């Protein structure tokens, strides 16, 4: 098992980042790949969780140990796999998540992709009271120069599809942001807030 990796961030895609260390490039699935944009070709530390399957060894990465802790709690719930947990972490509203779990807000929990009523109820059953305090929001929120356009929106939509959101939902998101100019990371954060509002 791995705790973290320290190396050079060499690539960003809609689903994952690549960190090179000792001549090897590690594919790491992350909640919002574009939150790492400022770190391309720089030394980064990514906290890791490894999932071993018959057909693949997968790495899931996080900005902070708090973000990783939320992910680990989520995958301990029956019905929540790593991809779904990553989509929940991507919303970057841990306070809202913890409040929903502690207050049995099933409707809020069902707004996450691939979370039905049964799984939402299981989340409450398994995780209520398990978060001593809501961790700080975990994404990289550094302001950046505004160099976005439709390409940035396209990348954001692609990343949201990878998180499990439906194309029909994302058509509305695209229409909402058409004509605006943001980074892919900012589009993703704003879109996730809109999707959670329903």
Curated annotation (Swiss-Prot):
Ranges for region Domain II: 64-142
Main location (coarse class): cytoplasm
Entry's localization field: Cytoplasm
Region (Domain III): 148-198
Signal peptide limits: none
Residue ranges of the region described as Flexible linker: 143-147
SMART domains per the UniProt record, alphabetical: HhH1
Subunit-level organization: Homotetramer. Forms an RuvA(8)-RuvB(12)-Holliday junction (HJ) complex. HJ DNA is sandwiched between 2 RuvA tetramers; dsDNA enters through RuvA and exits via RuvB. An RuvB hexamer assembles on each DNA strand where it exits the tetramer. Each RuvB hexamer is contacted by two RuvA subunits (via domain III) on 2 adjacent RuvB subunits; this complex drives branch migration. In the full resolvosome a probable DNA-RuvA(4)-RuvB(12)-RuvC(2) complex forms which resolves the HJ.
Protein's name in the database: Holliday junction branch migration complex subunit RuvA
Native species: Streptococcus pyogenes serotype M12 (strain MGAS2096)
């Amino acid at each position: 098992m791995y705790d973290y990796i320290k190396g050079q961030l060499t690539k960003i895609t809609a689903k994952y980042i690549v960190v090179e260390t000792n001549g090897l490039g590690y594919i790491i699935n992350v909640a919002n790949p574009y939150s790492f944009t400022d770190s391309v070709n720089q030394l980064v530390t990514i906290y890791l969780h490894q999932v071993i399957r018959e057909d693949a060894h997968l790495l899931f990465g996080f900005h902070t140990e708090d973000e990783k802790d939320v992910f680990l709690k989520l995958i301990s719930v029956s019905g929540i796999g790593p991809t779904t947990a990553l989509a929940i972490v991507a919303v970057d509203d841990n306070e809202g998540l913890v409040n929903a779990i502690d207050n049995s807000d099933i409707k809020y929990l069902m707004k996450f992709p691939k979370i039905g009523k049964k799984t939402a109820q299981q989340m409450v059953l398994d995780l209520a009271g398990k978060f001593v305090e809501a961790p700080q929001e975990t994404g990289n929120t550094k302001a950046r120069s505004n160099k976005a356009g439709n390409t940035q929106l396209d990348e954001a939509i692609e990343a949201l599809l990878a998180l499990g959101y439906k194309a029909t939902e994302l058509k509305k998101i695209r229409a909402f942001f058409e004509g605006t100019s943001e980074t892919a990371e900012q589009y993703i954060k704003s879109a996730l807030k809109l999707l959670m509002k329903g």
